[in-house]
Design a protein with these regions (language model features):
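Structured-RNA-binding interfaces characteristic of tRNA pseudouridine synthases
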Residues: 1-171
Length: 171
């Protein structure tokens, strides 16, 4: 309930840097243990900001595991979640045991058939109703998802499963 969140840390740092209460919205939520790269968010402030100065001040106030890459002006109607046309998830599967990356990858002991994985991933492209794959389909805005692409790539000992879709279902 009172757990530390990325959004909470970012909001607190921005409010300290700007001296005002701000509305902060992200382009999506992440489950516990899921890490976001290049997450887009919006912040509405009362005044004009000196972007470089605020960026430096905010990053100095954030813990080491959170970093803001840039601040960009956006129109009044921009909303990080509602304006986004797609989202991308990357699942990392390790083909060998790894001590340093174990929090970020799924280690599969058995050999994987990458060709079969690629063929299966390609079948996910298109418009599908995923209602059967979520716990509470009635709480979803829509269980119909447009999967732009699903690809399996190799990167050394890692397999990267990259899924780009209109949205993803909550549980």
């Amino acid at each position: 309930k009172n757990a530390r969140t990325v959004a909470g840390e970012v909001r607190q740092a921005i409010e300290a840097a700007t001296g005002e209460k701000v509305e902060l919205g992200g382009s999506g939520r992440t489950d516990a243990g899921v890490h976001a790269l290049a997450q887009v968010a919006h912040v509405k402030t009362a005044g004009k900001l000196r972007r470089e100065e605020v960026l430096r001040t905010v990053n100095d106030a954030l813990p080491a595991d959170i970093h803001i890459l840039s601040l960009e002006p956006a129109g009044d109607r921009f909303h990080a979640r509602h304006t986004a046309t797609s989202r991308c998830y990357v699942y990392q599967i390790s083909r060998r045991r790894t001590a340093l990356a174990k929090r970020f990858v799924w280690w599969v002991r058995r050999p994987l058939d990458v060709g079969a994985m690629r063929a299966g991933a390609a079948l996910l492209a298109g418009r599908h109703d995923f209602a059967r794959f979520c716990e509470k389909p009635l709480e979803q805005t829509s269980t119909v998802v447009v999967v732009e692409r699903c690809e399996v790539e190799t990167a050394g000992e890692l397999l990267l499963v990259r899924i780009v879709a209109s949205h993803f279902l909550w549980k």
